[in-house]
């Protein structure tokens, strides 16, 4: 978790078993499905990003393999340019289709994923 900063104050976050905390005490809980929501609590309530139906539709479409050639090429390019044991961030990862592909192709790398949609992160965390 030392790759991320607190979204409230900008201090480094420390990962704990049940979430993350910064030195100023701002804490972020880990969801049952394994992701940590780093959005500040003062945002308007509601579903940010893609909703459950949108995420499921994209997941189902991608699982049919239509974008597999693109994902495979992305993995080859990352392998060519990323150092061994690299830390790779997938910002705006959606439901994790490319994240999972890169993680499977480069098992020695640390893959981090971010998305504003809680529904997408629930699938990515699996």
Model-flagged regions — what are they?
Residues 95-107:
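Conserved SAM-binding loop of SAM-dependent methyltransferases across substrates and taxa
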Residues 52-70:
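Class I SAM-dependent methyltransferase Rossmann-like catalytic core
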Residues 65-84:
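Conserved alpha-helix/loop element of class I SAM-dependent methyltransferases that forms part
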Residues 85-94:
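Conserved class I S-adenosyl-L-methionine
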Residues 109-112:
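Short beta-strand element of Class I
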Residues 1-48:
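N-terminal auxiliary segments of SAM/dcSAM-dependent transferases
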Residues 124:
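Conserved SAM-binding loop
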Residues 115-119:
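Conserved SAM/SAH-binding beta-strand->alpha-helix loop
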């Amino acid at each position: 978790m030392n790759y991320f900063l607190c979204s409230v104050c900008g201090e480094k976050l420390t990962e704990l078993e049940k979430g993350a905390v910064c030195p100023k005490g701002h804490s972020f809980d880990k969801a049952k499905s394994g992701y940590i929501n780093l959005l500040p609590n003062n945002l308007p309530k509601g579903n940010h990003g893609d909703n459950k139906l949108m995420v499921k539709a994209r997941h189902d479409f991608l699982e049919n393999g239509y974008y597999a050639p693109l994902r495979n090429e992305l993995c080859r390019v990352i392998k060519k340019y990323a150092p061994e044991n690299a830390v790779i961030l997938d910002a705006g990862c959606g439901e994790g289709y490319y994240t999972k592909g890169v993680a499977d192709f480069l098992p020695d790398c640390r893959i981090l994923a971010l998305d504003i949609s809680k529904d997408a992160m629930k699938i990515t965390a699996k």
